[in-house]
Amino acid sequence: MMSFLVSIASIAMLVKIVLGTFANVFIVLVNFTDCIKKRKFLLADRILTVLAIFRFDLLWIILMNWSSSVFHVGLYFQVRFCICVVWIVTNHFNTWLANILSILYLLKIDNFSNLIFLGLKGKIKCPYIVLLPCFVLLFPNLIMVTICETTQANGHQGNLTGKTKLTYFTNLIAMTFTLGSLVPFTTFMICFLLLICSLCKHLRTMRLYGKGSQGPSASTHIKVLQVLISFLLLFSMFILLLIISDYNYTKSLEEPIHLICQVIGTLYPSRHSYILLWGNKRIKQAFVLAMVQVRARFWLKEKKP
């Protein structure tokens, strides 16, 4: 029964990673192709491209962690520290770049008359200032990983105190990761609430002048809101499943709850890439065109005798 569950979970994990990889590679190719053609690389496109690259790395790190922990446990304990460090770095930048992208989407809305937003629109051309907290908050996570790995090495030597510390620090690193995600998550929630306020203000203005609730500005608000809500749900689910998985990690790598949490948690990096693809009009059009061309080629091959 356990081997059957592992097989089903592995197939589901592989399918999600392949689909997520396809979306991220497509985003990078479309952005680079447009950059070469137009000789112009907008800030939002640059951030989206870097996010897709980090998302690609994260997906394959997740696959490496899965295959080594489930099928090669001995190998897993040898490469665990390297996988953990790379996973934390890639996931950290994934979270922050997605957060910065949501800020850019917010600042695209021209409905704000607040001086803070007018100032931000002028300074957002320098994203390095926004990325500064990202680099600062990365170091505590890496320090906690090093402490956790040292404690785990002592715990495997049969020291009861070390084993107790192993459980403590494994749980502590999960909490450190959660706290490290608190800043971008809070920023994201502020953007989300401000966008709702902006939409309500816009709808009131439209109704006041008898223009109804339809219009390009309202459509832009709703589209950005849909992207942000999707990210909010997926990221919240990812954090919750990560905490549950880490608390069960100290019991067994093959605990059903641990396997299920990992498989469902992969929805965040794989599905969110498609949401970003759908939310970008230019990339969405290229994706639809590519799918139509692929379908036409298959149809022509089937028609040939």
UniProtKB/Swiss-Prot annotation:
It is a multi-pass membrane protein. Several bitter taste receptors are expressed in a single taste receptor cell. The chain crosses the membrane at residues 10-30, 47-67, 70-90, 100-120, 128-148, 177-197, 224-244. Residues 31-46, 91-99, 149-176, 245-305 are cytoplasmic. CDD domains: 7tm_TAS2R43-like. PANTHER family: TASTE RECEPTOR TYPE 2, TASTE RECEPTOR TYPE 2 MEMBER 136. GO terms for cellular component: membrane. This is Taste receptor type 2 member 136. GO terms for biological process: detection of chemical stimulus involved in sensory perception of bitter taste. The gene is Tas2r136. Residues 1-9, 68-69, 121-127, 198-223 are extracellular.
